[in-house]
Design a protein with these regions (language model features):
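Polybasic, lysine-enriched low-complexity intrinsically disordered terminal tails
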Residues: 1, 206, 210-234
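Catalytic cores of DNA base-excision repair glycosylases
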Residues: 2-215
Length: 234
């Protein structure tokens, strides 16, 4: 089987096994998505979701963030790692959004990556979930799943993205990204992957997985191990 065909079958299999896969950050607006993704760096989504209701209520739009000092955000995000740096980035990004984009989150990669606190991965996540462009953002889970499946040996996120993007049509990049995140969190764990509960075990190379752990498992769909997602939109 050609690698492109296998990649397509993997995405199909994961989509069948995990029909509810979606972003787990809570947001209602484009700006809330951007802020939540910035805050999620090196932090679990659940922790971010605990912090953002108060933050979003206090700063309802880009103008509110732009008029604030980074310290004004601290009480709302103090529980998150690197909160001082993230608060500063959010304020600076909001000021640029106000001045350069009329208060609206830009919908192109170059414009997003020009904002403080926004790198390639963050921009890709925002583009995917705004439906504004095709991207395959690579986080820890996406990188691990891509390597375990045997599609890449790369550890650098940009190289993983390049090799995976070459195996899938652009219109499937965002879907594959979200499925790999969901799969990595629920089944393909870093230390003890649940190969028996994997919906695509028959297509997986199990690269780097000890033989004692990499039991064949069922090739058909499996149900996600955790509860349904919170209110983040697909």
């Amino acid at each position: 089987m050609k690698e492109r065909d296998r990649a397509g079958k993997v995405v199909d299999g994961l989509a069948g096994a995990m029909p509810d896969a979606r972003i787990e950050l809570d947001f209602r607006t484009d700006l809330e998505l951007l802020v939540a993704v910035i805050l999620s760096a090196q932090c679990r989504d659940a922790r971010v979701n605990e912090a953002t209701p108060g933050l979003f209520a206090a700063f309802p739009d880009a103008a509110a963030y732009a008029a604030a000092r980074p310290e004004d955000l601290w009480p709302h995000v103090r529980s998150l790692g690197l909160f001082r740096n993230k608060a500063k980035a959010i304020v600076l990004a909001a000021r640029a959004i106000e001045v350069e984009h009329g208060g609206r989150v830009p919908r192109t990669r170059p414009a997003l990556e020009a904002l403080a606190g926004v790198g390639r991965k963050t921009a890709g996540v925002v583009l995917v979930h705004l439906g504004a462009g095709h991207a395959f953002p690579v986080d820890t889970h996406v990188g691990r799943v891509s390597r375990r499946l045997g599609f890449t040996r790369q550890t650098d996120p940009d190289r993983v993205e390049a090799e995976m993007s070459a195996l899938l049509p652009p219109e499937r990049w965002g879907q594959a990204h979200q499925l790999f995140v969901w799969h990595g969190r629920r089944t393909c764990h870093a230390r003890k992957p649940d190969c028996e509960g994997c919906g695509v075990a028959g297509l997986c190379r199990k690269a780097g997985v000890p033989k004692a752990t990499a039991r064949t498992g069922a090739a058909g769909p499996s149900s996600p191990r955790r509860g349904s997602p919170r209110r983040g939109r697909p």
